[in-house]
C-alpha cells in the first residue's frame, strides 16, 4: 500500500473496476426488495455546476446505502435535452441545436462519471432522441382520442422578438424574460391538455404522500386552488347598450348586497365591445395587455380602470351597477369578471377610493361595529347588516341563504372552481418534440398514424433568431394527408419541454423497449422510492408528472397512482458575491477565486481586492451560485485538485441536504485533510502487519475495559450513521460521528493483539460507513484491509448489541443545581457507591468547602445533585 493519498490515481482505479464489472447495471429481481432512487435529470447546458454535484451526490449516497442493505437498486441518468436555451445558443454559435446538445451531453456525461456515481448507464436517455419523443407523440394521440388533448384559441403572452408564446412566469414587468421586448397579448390557437379533469384527484392525492415536504404539498394545493363559492349572473341593462349578462364567481356571496360595480378584464368580450367606439378605452385596454400577468404582480401594481358606460343589474335588488375595465382582473380566473364589494375587498376598496365609487359595508364583526367611514376594507367573516332579508346572518349562513335565493331566481348557484388551468403545450419553437398532426384542406386536422411515428425534427437546421425555422423548412412541413393522400402540411408548433420531463422516470425502467411506451418492468420499478431535486420544481414539473402518470394509468400503461413516493428538495449552493460599479452605472461581477479577502488580526473580514489589479472590490454578501453573479465554482477544478471524494465529502458535510450550503474553500481543504488522515490510519495499521479481519473479532466482554469503551463507541457510531442515513437523511451528522471515531482511533497506542484486532474491526466498519459518501477511497482501502474481497459485495454494518451495553456510564454532578463536574461509575453501581464517588470528586470538595450537606438527590443514569 502506498503511503500517500493520491486521489486521481485511486479514483481512476476504482471507476475502472466498477466499469469493468458492470456492478451498477440492474435488472428486475422479483424476490428482492427494489429501491428506485432518482435525481432530477439535468439540462445539458455544457458543464456541471455545484448544484448538480450536490443533487447527484445525495442520490448516490442513498443508492449505495440501500444497495448495501440488500436492495435491488436502480439509479439511472438522462438528459432533459430539448428547450429554448439550446436554440438560443445555436443562434449565437451558428451551429445546429442538435450538435450543441449532443456535444454537451458527451462532456457532462464524463463529468458525472468522474464523480463516481453508481449509475446504470445502460438506461441513459435523452429527450431529444426520436426513439424517446416518439412516445410523447404516441401518448398525445391517445389523449386526443380521449378528449384530454384538444385545440382552442386563447389569449396568450407573445414575445415579438423570440416570436413565441411565453408562460406567465416568463413575463417580467411586462417584458419577455430573455429578450426584454414588450410582451403582446395575442389570441393564438394552440393545443391544451385537460389537467383540470384530474384537479380533484391531484389535490386528494397529496394526502397520500407522507414522504413529501409539507411546503411542496402546500404549494401544489395552492396552485390547484380549489375554491367553494357561488356563480352569480348579473343581467344586462339593455338601455345602456350592455350586450350580454356577466357571470362572476365569488367565494364571498355573503357580501353580494354590498356590490357597487362590476369589473372585467381587459380581454373580456364586453371590454372589447365597449372599446369599439371609445378610443380612450381602447388605448387603456392596450396598456393593460402589456401589464402584469401574474397574480403576485397584479397585487402589487397600481390599480387602474376605466368605465365602459355599460351597466348590469344587481341580481337581487335590480340596482344598476356600472361595468368597469380594471387592470387587476385576470381573464384566466373565473369568467374574467368580478363583482366589486369595496367595503370587504382590499383591491376593490383601493379602486373605489381612486375613482370615487360607492363603498357600502354589509358585514361587521360578530363582536363589534365597523368604523364610519371605513379607513380600510373589512375582509373578515362576521354578521350581515343592511342586507334586506339576509341581514343579521352569520357570514356562512348568509352564503347559503343567498345561494339558495339566486338558484330559485335562476340568477346563480353554488360552484366549485379551480385556480388550475388546462396545460397549453404548443410552442412556436424549433428545438422541441413535434406535435404529430397534419393540416389538410380537405380533411382538416388529421393525426399522424402510429406507424408513421416518430415525426422527426430535421437536426441540421441552424436557427437565425427570426421565429420558428420549421415554418421555413418545406422538407419538414410539406407532406401528404394520411387520410386522403392530398398535399398537406405538418403542424410546426412543438411541445412544451415539460412534456418530455413528465414521464422520463417511467421510461428508464424499460428504456430499451422499442415496441411500446412501457412494459411490465415499469410496474416493477415504479413508483420512484426517492426523488431528489430543487424546490423550484415544486409546482410545474412535479404537478405535470403526477398528472401524466395518472393519464398513463387510466390508459392501462402503468399500475401506480403517484410517481414519487418520497421527495427530498435539496437546498441551494451559496457563495460570496464580489463586484464593482462601473462608470456607466452597470455592475461588473468577479468570481471569488479572482479575489483576495483581507482580514484583521482577529480574523474579521475588513475588505477584498481583485488579484489582477490590487484594487478594492465590494462584497455583495452571500448568494446562490449563478452565472449572472459570476460566483460559481467549477466542479471540475475541485475534482482535478482534490479528487471527487473530497468534493462529495464537503457537499455532504457542510450542511444538511435540505438546507442551503455555503461554499467554503477552508471546508474543502478540511474534507481533503480528513481523507488523508483516513488513508494514513489504514496505512499505519497495514504497516504493522495484519492478516486479520473483523470476522475474527474477539467477543466483546473479553476485551480490556479501555478497549471495550472504544468498541462501544464504534458500535454506537454504526447505530447513529445508520439512523442518519435511513431516517433523518442528515449526512453531515453521520460524517461527524465517523470523524469523531477516527480521532479516537488515531490516539490508540496499544499494539496488543486485542487492540490490533479492534483496530481492524473499527477501520473496516469506518470504511463501510463512509463508502456511500466517499466511494473511491473506500473501495481501495477495503482491498487493503480485506485482500481478495470487494467492498461492493459487503453488507451494511450491523451493531453488536453486546458492545452497546456500557460497563461504565458518565453522569453529571451538581451542587445546588449548578454543574460542578462529571464522574464515571459502574452501570450497576448502587446509590451509596454513587454518592461516595460524587462526594470524593475534587471539584465537589472544593465547592462544598466544609458546608453541611442537607441531602443528595440521585437521578439514576443521569445526575447527582448535592444540596448544601
UniProtKB/Swiss-Prot annotation:
Recorded catalytic reaction(s): these are: tRNA(Leu) + L-leucine + ATP = L-leucyl-tRNA(Leu) + AMP + diphosphate
Q: Does the keyword Ribonucleoprotein apply?
A: no
Keywords for the protein's UniProt record, in alphabetical order: Aminoacyl-tRNA synthetase, ATP-binding, Cytoplasm, Ligase, Nucleotide-binding, Protein biosynthesis
Q: Which PROSITE patterns match?
A: AA_TRNA_LIGASE_I
Per the Swiss-Prot or TrEMBL annotation, the motif 'HIGH' region is positioned at 42-52
Q: Does the keyword Protein biosynthesis apply?
A: yes
A cellular component term (GO) from this record? cytosol
Renumbered ranges of motif 'KMSKS' region: 624-628
Q: Which Pfam families match?
A: Anticodon_1, tRNA-synt_1, tRNA-synt_1_2, tRNA-synt_1g
Family statement: Belongs to the class-I aminoacyl-tRNA synthetase family.
User: Where does this one sit in the cell?
Assistant: Cytoplasm
The residues that hold ATP are 627
Identify the stretch annotated as signal peptide in this record.
Answer: none
Q: What is its main location?
A: cytoplasm
Q: Name one GO biological process term.
A: leucyl-tRNA aminoacylation
Coiled-coil annotation reads none
Disulfide pairs? none
Q: Name one GO molecular function term.
A: leucine-tRNA ligase activity
Under NCBIfam families, the record lists: leuS_bact (TIGR00396)
The protein in question is named Leucine--tRNA ligase
SUPFAM superfamilies per record: Anticodon-binding domain of a subclass of class I aminoacyl-tRNA synthetases, Nucleotidylyl transferase, ValRS/IleRS/LeuRS editing domain
Which EC number(s) does UniProt give?
Answer: 6.1.1.4
Database matches in Gene3D superfamilies:
2.20.28.290, 3.10.20.590, HUPs (3.40.50.620), Isoleucyl-tRNA Synthetase, Domain 1 (1.10.730.10)
Q: Which InterPro entries match?
A: aa-tRNA-synth_I_CS, aa-tRNA-synth_Ia, Leu-tRNA-ligase, Leu_tRNA-synth_edit, M/V/L/I-tRNA-synth_anticd-bd, Methionyl/Leucyl_tRNA_Synth, Rossmann-like_a/b/a_fold, tRNAsynth_Ia_anticodon-bd
Amino acid at each position: 500500500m502506498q503511503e500517500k493519498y493520491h486521489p486521481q490515481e485511486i479514483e481512476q482505479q476504482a471507476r475502472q473496476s466498477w466499469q469493468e464489472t458492470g456492478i451498477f447495471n440492474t435488472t428486475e429481481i422479483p424476490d428482492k426488495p427494489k429501491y428506485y432512487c432518482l435525481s432530477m435529470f439535468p439540462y445539458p447546458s455544457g458543464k456541471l455546476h455545484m448544484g448538480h454535484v450536490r443533487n447527484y451526490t445525495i442520490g448516490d449516497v442513498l443508492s449505495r446505502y440501500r444497495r448495501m442493505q440488500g436492495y435491488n437498486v436502480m439509479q439511472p441518468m438522462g438528459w432533459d435535452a430539448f428547450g429554448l436555451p439550446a436554440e438560443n445558443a445555436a443562434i449565437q454559435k451558428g451551429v445546429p441545436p442538435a450538435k450543441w446538445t449532443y456535444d454537451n451531453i458527451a462532456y457532462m456525461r464524463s463529468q458525472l462519471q468522474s464523480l463516481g456515481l453508481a449509475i446504470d448507464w445502460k438506461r441513459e436517455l435523452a429527450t431529444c432522441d426520436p426513439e424517446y419523443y416518439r412516445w410523447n407523440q404516441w401518448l398525445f394521440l391517445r389523449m386526443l382520442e380521449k378528449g384530454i388533448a384538444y385545440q382552442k384559441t386563447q389569449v396568450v403572452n407573445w414575445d415579438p422578438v423570440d416570436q413565441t408564446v411565453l408562460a406567465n412566469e416568463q413575463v417580467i414587468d411586462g417584458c419577455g424574460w430573455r429578450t426584454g421586448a414588450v410582451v403582446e397579448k395575442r389570441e393564438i390557437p394552440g393545443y391544451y391538455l385537460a389537467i383540470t379533469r384530474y384537479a380533484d384527484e391531484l389535490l386528494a392525492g397529496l394526502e397520500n404522500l407522507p414522504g413529501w415536504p409539507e411546503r411542496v404539498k402546500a404549494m401544489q394545493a395552492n396552485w390547484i386552488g380549489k375554491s367553494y363559492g357561488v356563480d352569480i349572473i348579473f343581467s344586462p341593462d339593455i338601455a345602456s347598450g350592455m350586450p350580454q349578462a356577466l357571470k362572476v364567481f365569488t367565494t364571498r356571496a355573503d357580501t353580494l348586497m354590498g356590490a357597487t360595480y362590476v369589473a372585467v378584464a381587459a380581454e373580456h368580450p364586453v371590454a372589447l365591445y365597449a372599446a369599439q367606439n371609445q378610443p380612450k378605452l381602447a388605448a387603456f385596454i392596450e396598456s393593460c395587455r402589456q401589464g402584469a400577468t401574474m397574480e403576485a404582480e397584479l397585487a402589487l401594481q397600481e390599480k387602474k380602470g376605466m368605465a365602459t358606460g355599460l351597466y348590469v343589474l344587481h341580481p337581487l335588488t335590480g340596482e344598476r351597477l356600472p361595468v368597469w375595465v380594471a387592470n387587476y382582473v385576470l381573464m384566466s380566473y373565473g369568467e374574467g369578471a368580478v363583482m366589486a364589494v369595496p367595503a370587504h375587498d382590499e383591491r376593490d376598496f383601493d379602486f373605489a377610493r381612486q375613482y370615487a365609487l360607492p363603498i357600502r359595508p354589509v358585514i361587521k364583526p360578530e363582536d363589534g361595529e365597523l368604523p364610519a367611514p371605513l379607513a380600510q376594507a373589512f375582509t373578515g367573516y362576521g354578521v350581515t347588516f343592511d342586507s334586506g332579508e339576509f341581514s343579521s346572518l352569520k357570514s356562512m349562513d348568509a352564503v347559503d341563504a343567498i345561494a339558495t335565493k339566486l338558484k330559485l331566481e335562476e340568477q346563480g348557484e353554488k360552484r366549485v372552481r379551480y385556480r388550475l388551468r388546462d396545460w397549453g403545450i404548443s410552442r412556436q419553437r424549433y428545438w422541441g418534440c413535434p406535435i404529430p398532426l397534419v393540416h389538410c384542406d380537405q380533411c382538416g386536422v388529421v393525426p399522424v398514424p402510429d406507424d408513421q411515428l416518430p415525426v422527426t425534427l430535421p437536426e441540421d437546421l441552424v436557427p437565425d433568431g427570426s421565429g420558428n425555422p420549421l415554418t421555413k423548412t418545406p422538407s419538414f412541413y410539406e407532406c401528404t394527408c394520411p387520410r386522403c393522400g392530398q398535399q398537406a402540411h405538418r403542424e410546426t408548433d412543438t411541445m412544451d419541454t415539460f412534456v418530455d420531463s413528465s414521464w422520463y422516470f417511467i421510461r428508464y425502467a424499460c428504456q430499451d423497449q422499442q415496441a411500446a411506451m412501457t412494459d411490465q418492468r415499469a410496474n416493477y420499478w415504479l413508483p420512484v422510492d426517492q426523488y431528489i431535486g430543487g424546490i423550484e420544481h415544486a409546482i410545474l414539473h412535479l404537478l405535470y408528472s403526477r398528472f401524466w402518470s395518472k393519464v398513463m394509468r387510466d390508459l392501462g400503461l402503468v399500475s401506480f397512482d403517484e410517481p414519487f413516493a418520497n421527495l427530498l428538495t435539496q437546498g441551494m449552493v451559496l457563495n460570496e458575491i464580489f463586484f464593482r460599479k462601473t462608470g456607466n452605472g452597470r455592475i461588473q461581477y468577479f468570481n471569488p477565486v479572482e479575489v483576495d479577502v483581507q482580514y484583521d488580526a482577529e480574523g474579521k473580514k475588513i475588505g477584498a481586492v481583485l488579484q489582477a489589479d490590487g484594487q478594492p472590490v465590494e462584497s455583495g454578501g452571500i448568494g446562490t451560485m449563478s452565472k449572472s453573479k459570476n460566483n460559481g465554482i467549477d466542479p471540475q477544478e475541485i475534482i482535478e485538485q482534490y479528487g471527487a471524494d473530497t468534493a462529495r465529502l464537503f457537499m455532504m458535510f457542510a450542511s444538511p441536504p435540505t438546507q442551503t450550503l455555503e461554499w467554503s474553500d477552508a471546508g474543502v481543504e478540511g474534507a481533503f485533510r480528513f481523507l488523508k488522515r483516513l488513508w494514513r490510519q489504514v496505512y499505519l495499521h497495514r504497516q504493522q502487519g495484519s492478516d486479520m479481519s473483523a470476522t475474527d473479532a474477539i467477543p466483546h466482554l473479553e476485551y480490556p475495559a479501555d478497549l471495550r469503551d472504544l468498541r462501544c463507541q464504534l458500535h454506537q457510531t454504526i447505530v447513529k450513521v445508520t439512523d442518519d442515513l435511513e431516517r433523518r437523511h442528515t449526512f453531515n451528522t453521520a460524517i461527524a460521528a465517523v470523524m469523531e471515531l477516527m480521532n479516537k482511533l488515531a490516539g490508540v497506542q496499544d499494539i496488543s493483539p486485542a487492540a490490533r484486532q479492534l483496530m481492524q474491526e473499527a477501520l473496516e466498519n469506518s470504511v463501510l460507513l463512509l463508502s456511500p459518501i466517499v466511494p473511491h477511497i473506500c473501495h481501495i482501502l477495503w482491498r487493503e484491509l480485506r485482500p481478495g474481497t470487494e467492498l461492493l459485495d459487503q453488507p451494511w454494518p450491523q451493531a453488536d448489541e453486546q458492545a452497546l451495553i456500557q460497563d461504565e456510564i458518565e453522569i453529571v454532578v451538581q451542587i445546588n443545581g449548578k454543574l460542578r463536574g462529571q464522574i464515571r461509575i459502574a452501570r450497576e453501581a448502587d446509590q451509596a457507591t454513587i454518592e461516595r464517588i460524587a462526594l470524593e470528586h475534587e471539584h465537589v470538595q472544593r465547592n462544598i468547602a466544609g458546608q453541611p450537606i442537607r441531602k443528595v438527590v440521585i437521578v439514576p443514569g443521569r445526575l447527582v445533585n448535592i444540596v448544601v
